[in-house]
Amino acid sequence: MEQDSNGGSDAGRDYARDLGDEPAPAIRDSAPDFLAPIDADAPVSGHNPPPEPTSSPAESPEQDWSRARDLIYPAFRPVGTQGLDIEAIDRDSLAAHSQQSHAQPLLDVGPAELPVVYTIDAGAYDIVVNGDHLLSWGVEPSDIQDAAMSNLFNWSATAPWTDEVSGDRRLISSDTGAGWDAVRILLPAVLAHLEAELRPAGRILIGLPERHLMTAGSLRPGDDDFATLFADFIVETSGGADEPIDRRVFELVDGRLVEFGGVTSLR
């Protein structure tokens, strides 16, 4: 490259480019045949065509119940979450207004009035089941509930527990990170496990601060400080969570989850 003798420029002339260093252009020796079959391997505007899709959108879980039913799980949401009451939903009414959007989530009521939604596990994210999904699948709300609880049961059967002991105090937690740790408390088998492990030592306190954590501990007679420490932990964990659920402390009483009334409530 040499400096341009005309001056006024910081860039010199590129004689190699001026003289041409590209391949010789292809010159047609005949007119194009517009009726000839298109070469599938020919470049398009200098690029290769995109690959053909391997599946149809109609086969996605959002459209195909046979694919969705093995991917549906329940999930807790904070109190105040709005949606379509799954127990009162009328499929015929939804179908009569099928041209309208029914994007509100199907909403169930869990223990201690905790809202429950249903989600499709899509791997890196979840899809919350709504009224449009119900219409697309052509199933009853009870089918969604049954499938979700069945999938949760199968997962929980092999999911591990974290067991922590400090002196006479003991915590049993589910913190696998799979996304179904908190909602695991819906399963009778889980309630029975906590009863067997923690009831002999005292009352059973339970926290559901966020989606990825369910923790339970024994409140022993005379250890009132444990209840305070447990409550502080739940509030702190829920406050720093990406998907918080509830800051309350619950108690397992007669096989039911109820709001903890304090250390003197059952004395």
Which residues does each PLM region occupy?
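Extended, low-hydrophobicity segments enriched in charged/polar residues
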Residues: G12-S166
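A contiguous, surface-oriented mixed alpha/beta subdomain in the mid-to-C-terminal portion of proteins
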Residues: H97-L252, L257-V263, R267
